[in-house]
Design a protein with these regions (language model features):
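Extracellular/virion structural assembly segments
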Residues: 1-158
Length: 158
């Protein structure tokens, strides 16, 4: 089984199986894309003026997991518990402060640092090639990477 680990806020680095999530797949990216050049064009001039400098752009990193559960209710309970671990208790206005997460993909040798989106509730079980319902729910989780320089797409062995 492929090992992927997660650190939420200042917590410990744990295997995602701690949450009942088994890694399936993730983005195929090998780095952040660059932002486009800043440019200015004037009607009375040919072409445009550019500033030939560009920084890395923010991006969404998507990860697929499966959850082995006997019912949708059990799978959604695991999702709810995970989602609640991603943020502090809502304040008096109902605002949640999300923790920064660090996702370590030991298979692809990636370290992704960003802010998590909550995983939506599962609605159906996965079906096999014979259209038989299996006790597996497939979920997709997105991490919003706001500062790509914190990520490492060539992580050394630890």
């Amino acid at each position: 089984m492929i090992t992927v680990r997660l650190k939420i806020g200042d917590g410990e680095i744990v295997d995602t199986q701690t949450f009942g999530f088994i890694y399936l797949d993730s983005d195929k990216r090998v780095g952040a894309e660059s932002k486009g050049f800043e440019s200015t064009a004037y009607p009375e001039e040919e072409g445009e003026h550019i500033l030939p400098k560009a920084a890395d752009d923010a991006f969404d990193y998507k990860i697929k997991f499966f959850i082995q559960a006997t019912s949708l209710k059990d799978a959604n309970q695991l999702i709810t518990e995970f989602n609640e671990s991603l943020h502090d208790t809502p304040d008096e206005l109902g605002l949640k402060t999300y923790h920064q997460v660090t996702f370590y993909n030991d298979y692809k040798r990636h370290k992704i640092v960003g802010y998590p989106n909550e995983i939506p509730e599962a609605t159906d079980f996965w079906r096999d090639h014979r259209n038989q319902v299996e006790d597996i729910v497939i979920i997709e989780w997105t991490i919003r990477v706001t500062k790509p320089s914190l990520c490492d797409f060539n992580l050394g062995a630890e």
